[in-house]
């Protein structure tokens, strides 16, 4: 395939060229605990030439009475990091973010594990999401909320296991064609009600996961 040929090309390049094939290496099955074939990214200081290291960001260094990680609350964005497939306006997806899942719910579960693994390796304490980032919409509001109810406990379990926090949650009120005229501004009462139900569910999930804000 074109992607496999591109991977072979990147593997022949030294330095930063090694990053792409490394990041795209994923493992199969839920019994495998590692999705990204990289180690934890350490702080090595300004003189480091290691592309897999921090040169300026030292998370536990205290500045003005607070650790860097408390001043700079970096957050993993679920949609860009775990869902976006690299599509641009004139092309198709170039990144496979299914993590070897075979159906939408299996993919959603894989993404949860991949999320917390990557947060650990990058030293990120927070994450954030839209509702449809973490679970598939399905064919109805009932199915969407059922899918969320299955995935959210897994997220909570992983948060507790890895000591991570939710910075904020929100509802995606733009990705589905039903929102062609907006959500709260829609001229269709059914669309308005659907949006309200999405928001209510997303707020409940955010509160349940101890989110620090709702967007």
Task: Please tell me what each predicted stretch does.
Residues 8-11, 18-28:
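Short, positively charged and aromatic/hydrophobic N-terminal segments
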Residues 27-213:
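N-terminal pre-domain/capping segments
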